[in-house]
Amino acid sequence: MKKTTLLHEGKAKKVFLTDEADLVIQEFKDDATAFNNKKKGTIAEKGVVNNAISCKLFTMLEGEGVRTHLVEKLSDRDMLCKKLDIIKVEVVVRNIAAGSLVKRYGFTEGSVLREPIVEFYLKNDDLDDPLMNESHAVALGVASLDELAVLGTRALRVNEVLKPFFAGVKLKLVDFKLEFGRHHGEILLGDEISPDTCRFWDLETNEKLDKDRFRLDLGGIEDAYSEVQKRVLGSGALS
């Protein structure tokens, strides 16, 4: 499978058309951004790490009944995917209070939430991806109530699968962002699952092992991403 036309370039990935109309190639970049592109940099080999982790986790989720856009891993940086009509909703699941949740509601950082919190954000960089509810999403025409119900249920199912998996490799799944898309009438999980889109803390020390190291200028970014990759892939499947 070969890349043809560049369909879209985002902050962390490029998406290329292929010679099959229903398939695209997602190429992972080393570019790093934070605060909706206000902070920019590069993390060496980030694309390789995130592709490897995402392929492993998507494969695991498929085995647990969560349909994803993954077809196969093509190379270190390239993932062959089903072409999706992306739903302009970012779904965030939170297990532990961190980041904007602490700022908005006064939670103590690190406090375990009684139940996972599911949040919807409008996928719009120009508006800084604002938090929204179901009524906003329907009014904006980005998703129907039925679709939003699927997104919420599917996101919680992903959490049910991934949270114990990460605990098994000594990582706390603090929170994570998911994106979904429509494919021939079906809603599939898309994008990626990686230290770019998740907060991971070491189970014993609470050391941050994700993009917060870039956001907060903590240093050791490459080592943190590599450590997550080692733990995830060392658990037994794809390399």
From Swiss-Prot:
Question: Does the entry feature the keyword Nucleotide-binding, yes or no?
Answer: yes
Q: Does the keyword Kinase apply?
A: no
Q: In which pathway does it act?
A: Purine metabolism; IMP biosynthesis via de novo pathway; 5-amino-1-(5-phospho-D-ribosyl)imidazole-4-carboxamide from 5-amino-1-(5-phospho-D-ribosyl)imidazole-4-carboxylate: step 1/2
Give the first-level EC class, as a single word: ligase
Superkingdom field? Bacteria
Please name the GO terms that the record assigns under molecular function.
ATP binding; phosphoribosylaminoimidazolesuccinocarboxamide synthase activity
Q: Which reaction does it catalyse?
A: 5-amino-1-(5-phospho-D-ribosyl)imidazole-4-carboxylate + L-aspartate + ATP = (2S)-2-[5-amino-1-(5-phospho-beta-D-ribosyl)imidazole-4-carboxamido]succinate + ADP + phosphate + 2 H(+)
Recorded hits in Pfam families, A to Z, give: SAICAR_synt
Supply the EC number(s): 6.3.2.6
Q: Name one GO biological process term.
A: cobalamin biosynthetic process
What keywords would UniProt list here? ATP-binding, Ligase, Nucleotide-binding, Purine biosynthesis
Q: Which InterPro entries match?
A: SAICAR_synt/ADE2_N (IPR028923), SAICAR_synt_PurC (IPR033934), SAICAR_synth (IPR001636), SAICAR_synthetase (IPR050089), SAICAR_synthetase_CS (IPR018236)
Sorted alphabetically, which NCBIfam families does this protein's record hold? Answer: purC
Q: Give the family this protein belongs to, as stated in its UniProt record.
A: Belongs to the SAICAR synthetase family.
Q: Return the PANTHER family for the record.
A: MULTIFUNCTIONAL PROTEIN ADE2 (PTHR43599), SI:DKEY-6E2.2 (PTHR43599:SF3)
Designated name of the protein: Phosphoribosylaminoimidazole-succinocarboxamide synthase
Please report the organism this UniProt entry assigns to the protein: Chlorobium luteolum (strain DSM 273 / BCRC 81028 / 2530) (Pelodictyon luteolum)
Q: What is the lineage of its organism?
A: Bacteria, Pseudomonadati, Chlorobiota, Chlorobiia, Chlorobiales
Report which gene this protein is encoded by.
purC
